């Protein structure tokens, strides 16, 4: 077993992180102890990492421990997932001078948390397309518990190779639509065959990521934007077509009707170069 202690030099709202992550029944969280167990797959090894917050918003500190895994590689991934690589003060100061200031006062120093796995991020995006959040959450949980693996009470998403071999009929029996079942299996096959290499696009420009993902059935602009935001941690994404974003903007600005594209574009420009944080806090405002 190994463990590491991390102290951040800037404010960080870990309680808000755990609160949002607790909406997903697949996440193993102990809110009272400020603990989450993170499933990581590094070099084809499944690793359960225990993360505990032991500090405050103004003085954030963490204990990270695991029974397995290369500590250096695990810590590199944990820093990326939980946004420990970049101070928030510049982001916070930027939004305190925008029309979204009230949101950034309410949810101050809440980071964007990445999906624990790139393939899982794309799978989740496809499952969540065009259905309500509650049903999407149920479908995702059932899917992972049926095809994924469990280690120490923590569930790991299935690998692309496993998903590639699921039959469409089997997914249809689990209330997936015909088209969505085809998208899920097709994505697994694209990665398993080497047609799509998710590791290779981590550092590529947004246009290059889009060029590789959009030809795959079931992946459109909304999915690419969400993957860039929650899979790769890009800071300047603002999915204007997202219904939740539209509802949130309508509420924040007290509009009679949903905002049109011109209004959303104006909000987006005001938020640059940190649009992803605006999107996150807008979503939080309607949770």
Describe the predicted segments one by one:
Residues 1-287:
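HhH-family (HhH-GPD) DNA N-glycosylase catalytic core used in base-excision repair
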């Amino acid at each position: 077993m190994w463990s590491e202690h991390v102290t951040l030099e800037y404010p960080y709202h870990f309680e808000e992180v755990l609160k949002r992550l607790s909406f997903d029944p697949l996440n193993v969280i102990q809110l009272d102890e400020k603990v989450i167990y993170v499933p990581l797959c590094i070099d084809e090894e499944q690793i359960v990492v225990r993360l505990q917050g032991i500090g405050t918003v103004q003085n954030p500190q963490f204990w990270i421990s695991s029974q397995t895994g290369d500590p250096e590689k695990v810590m590199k991934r944990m820093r990326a997932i939980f946004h420990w690589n970049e101070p928030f003060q510049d982001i916070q100061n930027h939004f305190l001078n925008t029309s979204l200031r009230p949101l950034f006062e309410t949810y101050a120093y809440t980071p964007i948390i990445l999906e624990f796995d790139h393939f899982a991020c794309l799978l989740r995006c496809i499952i969540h397309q065009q259905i309500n959040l509650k049903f999407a959450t149920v479908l995702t949980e059932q899917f992972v518990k049926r095809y994924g693996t469990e280690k120490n009470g923590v569930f790991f998403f299935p690998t692309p190779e496993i998903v590639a071999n699921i039959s469409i009929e089997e997914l249809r029996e689990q209330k997936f639509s015909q088209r969505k079942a085809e998208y899920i299996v097709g994505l697994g096959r694209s990665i398993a065959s080497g047609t799509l290499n998710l590791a290779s696009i981590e550092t590529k420009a947004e246009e290059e990521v889009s060029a590789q993902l959009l030809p795959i059935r079931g992946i459109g602009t909304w999915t690419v934007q969400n993957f860039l935001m929650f899979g790769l941690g890009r800071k300047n994404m603002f999915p204007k077509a997202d219904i939740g974003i539209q509802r949130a903007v309508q509420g924040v600005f007290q509009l009679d009707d949903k905002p049109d594209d011109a209004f959303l574009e104006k909000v987006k420009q005001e938020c640059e170069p940190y649009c992803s944080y605006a999107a996150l806090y807008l979503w939080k405002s309607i949770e």
